[in-house]
């Protein structure tokens, strides 16, 4: 039989905090808690973004929602949907294999639990254009990726098939124009 010391309530006041450094196994090992995510996201890139979005993530948001990934890029080569799948995968961010046409991506993603709104937040956010919006195809819409968010709120995107099948190009949208679009975050 083992005997374990009894803890007094006064012992419980010396609790671990989330500030400073923790000493690990040996004196030369430290862990800076400022470099540790506070998110419960399994995807480390999503965890980092959630830390940056602390205070604005929707209540009840589950970062470990179903992603819709099902066997890789199922979109036709060179289409806008193909590019966005490729680029999000390169960035280590979740993306679904069967979100449909560009104009369907916000609803498809929202239905799986992704955070979707009208605010560009991060490089890697998916940008959804409705049919005819900013010269998007009137039937299929369009989808692109944020590559840069400028200090004035304007965004720079990369896209495919705006200048020809498989042609990767870029455009810049003012903050006012960007606010008219939908953004799929994570």
List the model feature ranges, each with a label:
Residues 2-9:
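Short, small-residue-biased leader/transition segments that mark boundaries at the very start
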Residues 4, 93-102, 167-173:
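Short, exposed beta-strand "edge-strand" segments with a Pro/Gly-rich flavor and a Y/T-containing core
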Residues 11-48:
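Extracytoplasmic intrinsically disordered, low-complexity "stalk/linker" and propeptide segments
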Residues 24, 29-32, 59, 117, ...:
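Intrinsically disordered, low-complexity, compositionally biased regions/tails
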Residues 41-143, 148, 159:
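Secreted/periplasmic proteins that engage bacterial cell-wall peptidoglycan
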Residues 147-186:
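Aromatic- and glycine-rich peptidoglycan recognition patches
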């Amino acid at each position: 039989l083992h005997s374990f010391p009894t803890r007094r309530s006064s012992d419980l006041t010396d609790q671990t905090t989330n500030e400073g450094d923790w000493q690990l196994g040996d004196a030369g090992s430290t862990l800076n808690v400022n470099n540790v995510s506070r998110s419960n996201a399994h995807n480390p890139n999503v965890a980092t973004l959630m830390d940056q979005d602390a205070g604005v993530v929707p209540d009840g948001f589950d970062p470990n929602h179903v992603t819709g990934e099902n066997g890789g890029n199922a979109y036709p080569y060179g289409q806008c949907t193909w590019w966005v799948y490729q680029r999000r995968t390169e960035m280590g961010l979740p993306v679904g294999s069967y979100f449909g046409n560009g104009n369907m991506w916000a609803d498809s993603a929202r239905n799986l639990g992704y955070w979707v709104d009208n605010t560009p937040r991060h490089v890697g956010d998916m940008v959804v254009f409705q049919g005819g919006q900013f010269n998007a195809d009137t039937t299929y819409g369009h989808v692109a990726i944020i590559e840069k968010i400028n200090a004035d709120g304007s965004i720079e995107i990369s896209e495919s098939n705006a200048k020809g099948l498989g042609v990767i190009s870029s455009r810049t949208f003012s903050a006012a124009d960007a606010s008219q679009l939908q953004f799929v975050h994570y």
